Amino acid sequence: MTRQFGLIGHPLGHSKSPVMHEAAYKDMGLDAVYCAYDISPQELGNAIRTMKAQGIDGFNVTIPHKVAIIDYLDEIDEDAEAMGAVNTVVCQDGRWVGKNTDADGYIESLLPVVSDQSLTGRRVLVIGAGGAARAVIHALGKQRATISVSNRTAEKAQELAQLFSHLTIEAIPLNEAESTLGTYDVLINTTSVGMYPDTSKQPIALDRLKQATIVSDLIYNPYETALLQEAKQRGNRILNGIGMFVNQGALSIEHWTGRKPNRKCMERVVRMHLT
């Protein structure tokens, strides 16, 4: 019997999840399909009830539903609870359990580009205050980094700092983030600013960026955002979102099937389908 997996979010026109997952299933010899469901916030409740009735085995969750989905689940695990965000839902004995593979997926991509593979005491600036930012901050906290979070809407950054008040974290205005950029070891963009098709935009000005800073962008389409292109021209080490995207997807598949997919196969397919 064909297993059914999928992705819910809005909008989903840019997503490479279906081609990545189906390539992984084929490589694994798994009889499964992965469908994208473009669901607006207003439709979320009805859509979840329909998916449950259809017997879907599991699904991923992306913008803007990572927080709102929690109200419709039977249970969430410890990591998802700490982040207040879910990106993976697993059907276990008829119960829907929320998990979050974004945090581990991101750190697995970041640590190899950090000089000594340690973030302890490193100063990290996170731009954005959505579900992806929650995952990144949770992951950085586990690594004992010193975190600043900044967002266009300052109140949202403050709310995030309060949520993670057990960590070494502060919320700062975006103009302060730009003026103090030279004090950070890692800069991470978790927003959708610069994502296809609006590829000319940047979430922060890099005028005060020091060359030793690692610049990371969770966006994977385009392969190099305007932010990463400028950082690269300045001589900085850069990290795009493909590693995190592949890693979180692979970890989701492990939760659903108990098997490890071929991540190199998944990455190859994503690269092939980028604009």
From Swiss-Prot:
The keyword Amino-acid biosynthesis applies. Homodimer. Involved in the biosynthesis of the chorismate, which leads to the biosynthesis of aromatic amino acids. Catalyzes the reversible NADPH linked reduction of 3-dehydroshikimate (DHSA) to yield shikimate (SA). HAMAP family: Shikimate_DH_AroE. It comes from the Bacteria. Its EC number is 1.1.1.25. Shikimate binds at S15, K16, S17, T62, N87, D102, Y220. Keywords: Amino-acid biosynthesis, Aromatic amino acid biosynthesis, NADP, Oxidoreductase. This is Shikimate dehydrogenase (NADP(+)). GO terms for molecular function: NADP binding; shikimate 3-dehydrogenase (NADP+) activity. GO terms for cellular component: cytosol. One of its GO terms (biological process) is amino acid biosynthetic process. Pathway: Metabolic intermediate biosynthesis; chorismate biosynthesis; chorismate from D-erythrose 4-phosphate and phosphoenolpyruvate: step 4/7. It catalyses: shikimate + NADP(+) = 3-dehydroshikimate + NADPH + H(+).
